[in-house]
Amino acid sequence: MISKEILIQYSDLQEEVKEVRERIERTERQIAKIEEDGNVIDTVSGGGGGIQHFKIEGFPYPEYSRKKTLLYARKATLASLELELMEMLNQVEEFIASVDDSRMRRILTMRFIDNMSFEQIGKVIGYDRTSISKKIDKFFEE
């Protein structure tokens, strides 16, 4: 039987997937900026006792390569997390479907699958947020 901890774990896993997606988007933006900016220019001193200055221009391959590698790793992590999330979702839905009380099924679905707050659930069901919280706590105490 699924316990409250697994339902909470499912909610946490949903948030983790969202965070990884945000990191992927941020990395993709960084890569796009590197590609857009193209070559970088730097000035170095050297020759003749260090009084001559040379301008060096080139594409920042090391940084670009690191970002690309990071992006691939994050995408692999996301795929793994999404698979785990789908497997856990099936378990959670089976557990909720096994609950006899229709109102409790609705409350559990809104709270753990739809990730709604107690206040949002209360508005839909017609209770205040503390009643929703107490109903969930009482359900898991049984």
Which functions belong to the PLM regions below?
Residues 96-100, 131:
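Short coil/turn residues that cap or connect secondary-structure elements
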Residues 100-114:
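Short amphipathic alpha helix immediately N-terminal
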Residues 136-140:
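DNA major-groove recognition helix of helix-turn-helix
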